[in-house]
Amino acid sequence: SNAESLTIPIIGFCKKGARTLLSSRCMKFCSNCGQLVIAKVPSGDHLPRFVCEACGTIHYQNPNIIAGCIPEWQGKLLLCRRAIEPRRGFWTVPAGFMENGEAVQDAAAREAQEEALADVEIGSLVSIINVIRTHQVHIVFRARLRNTNFGVGPESLEVALYDEADIPWDEIAFMSVEFALRRYLDDRRARRELTHFCDIDWHDGRFVLRDR
């Protein structure tokens, strides 16, 4: 074996170690040869990976990118009420997982079309948010609605334009969405377009946001 420094039983590792090391989507079998994998630190590495000792394949897991945008029309912001878990029934901006083979701006525009049937022009970057516990990076852009022909996509219960004063802050789905919205509005009032950064992580039984 090339990885003798640390070997961890696969089941126990997934339950206890995934928070900082590997994704909680536990891998049991090698996608290359079909044999069982184990979690270990490969030689020359510093983090546990899923390793197949039969064929030697090391399966790397890396953070996922969530791309989204804040579409605006005549001063109002387009929000979607989620039809799926997590946080079903809460409001969010159009956003979702980036696909292979697309640019992050194109992913944000696609998500707006899928979730809100909205045709948007992607603008400057609002925020980059490191959601460390879930191994995600949330990237949110400013956007302009090209028209008001939006509607309810399959992942939304409702889609609506909101004046700043009417945004349902108590019903916003995720801390990352609230961060992006508030920074967007701060910048709009100040007539500027900045990019904002923060980390969201789990401390003492709750999510904590820290600006960078």
Question: Where on the chain are the PLM-derived regions?
Answer:
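Unchanged
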Residues: 98-121, 125-183, 187-188, 192-194, ...
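Conserved hydrophobic/aromatic beta-strand scaffold that supports enzyme active sites
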Residues: 29, 49, 70, 79, ...
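Leucine-biased recognition of intrinsically disordered, low-complexity hydrophobic segments
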Residues: 6, 21-22
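Conserved Nudix-box catalytic region and its N-terminal flanking loop in Nudix hydrolases
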Residues: 72-114
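Acidic, metal-coordinating catalytic segment for phosphate/diphosphate chemistry
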Residues: 28-68
